[in-house]
Amino acid sequence: MAKHSDPNSKLIAENRRARFDYFIEEEIEAGIMLLGSEVKSLRQGGSNIGESYASVEEGELWLINGYIAPYLQAKTWGHEERRKRKLLVSRRELARLWTATAREGMTIVPIRMYFNDRGIVKLKIGIAKGKKLSDKRETSAKRDWSREKQRLLKQNS
């Protein structure tokens, strides 16, 4: 019997707070320029994108404050854990991202980092608008109600 690869098994890191803190308007897949020791560290699962963001600087897209743990078997100089990493998108997508962030209140948020089918590290980024506290409460209330509804349906059936 053939093994089916689970898409979540290729997941490296996920920004779980992104959908809670932001309204994600559009998602874009971007490549990321990494060093060899960074890729090896990602294969071991040492990454965190929860506090990171992306920005367009001098006509290029950069991931800022993304954490990749040091690879222990690397040579002594290894890599810097929180360095700026260049994101690879097409010129059309870059122009769209730049115009989106030029609008007030819009930002580029990393959503998920994963290996694609060819084993290349990809980053799913989203054009997002920050939620206010009342929006967060509304999202939380909807989620709680849907859980309660599912629990009641399960009890009654």
From Swiss-Prot:
Gene3D superfamilies from the UniProt entry? 2.40.280.10
Which InterPro entries has this protein been placed in? SmpB, SsrA-bd_prot, SsrA-bd_prot_CS
Where in or outside the cell it occurs: the entry states: Cytoplasm
The record's CDD domains line, in alphabetical order, gives:
SmpB
Supply one GO CC term from the record: cytosol
Gene Ontology terms describing biological process: trans-translation
**Annotated Basic and acidic residues bias:** 136-151
Annotated GO MF terms: RNA binding
Q: Where is this region: Disordered?
A: 136-157
What family name appears in the similarity comment? Belongs to the SmpB family.
Q: What is this protein called?
A: SsrA-binding protein
